[in-house]
Amino acid sequence: MDLQRIYDRRKSRLVDELAIAKYGMLGLMLMENAGRNVAYELLARTPCRRVVIVVGKGNNGGDGWVIARHLDAAGVDVIVLLTTAPNEFRGDAAVNYAIANLAKIKIIDLSRTPTAEAIATHFAEADWLVDAMLGTGATGEPRGAMRLAIEAINQSSVRTLAVDLPTGIDCDSGGAATVAVRADVTCTFVTLKPCCQVAACRSYLGEVRVIDIGVPRALLEEIDAMP
């Protein structure tokens, strides 16, 4: 776990870009490594019998689909809550959505769920909630079903794990949107982020774990040398 490096939004994006363009890695490989290692982190935190994963449409949601698949393979009862229409998934996230669908993982569309209270009914008997809605690249206010899901998560007593960063937290400033997930554990990828050093942000992050996604050390050293 690398606790020395701190990469902002720009450098975090460069990790993926260089891994693919220069080091010959596939985006699907990076997503698989990220999601699998978060799933292992969850499985190490017992009890982990039932997990509800709330996904967005981007790569953070794609990580959520990988997490769901690995938890399902380990015998965990998994439910995935969609905050976006299935046809909005693109690229690697769409591939992993299709795999989860074929694997018959339980998927529930929240787009017509009218209230946070209605969303919270899906949390019954869960050991963990997983926030896989927005990650380091996100800015601005969460809207629609995503906003309602955040309210439901924060009103719940179920332990919450955020993927990369809690939805609604700005990677660089540590500022919180008017609604932002308050996580018990945050699994951020490759390095810490600037927001991890902001005192006011700590109540949203909870325990921070840095998760390896298998990028070469040479790649990180190359980014370290950049201004």
Curated annotation (Swiss-Prot):
Q: Give me the residues that bind (6S)-NADPHX, please.
A: N59, N60, G61, G62, D63, G135, T136, G137, A138, T139, G140, E141, D164
Q: Which InterPro entries match?
A: YjeF_N_dom, YjeF_N_dom_sf
The protein in question is named NAD(P)H-hydrate epimerase
Recite the UniProt keywords alphabetically.
Answer: Isomerase, Metal-binding, NAD, NADP, Nucleotide-binding, Potassium
Enzyme Commission number(s) from the entry: 5.1.99.6
Concerning SUPFAM superfamilies, the annotation shows: YjeF N-terminal domain-like (SSF64153)
Family in the record: Belongs to the NnrE/AIBP family.
Coiled-coil parts of chain: none
Question: Which lineage ranks, top first, belong to the organism behind this chain?
Answer: Bacteria, Pseudomonadati, Planctomycetota, Planctomycetia, Pirellulales
Q: How is the cofactor bound?
A: Binds 1 potassium ion per subunit.
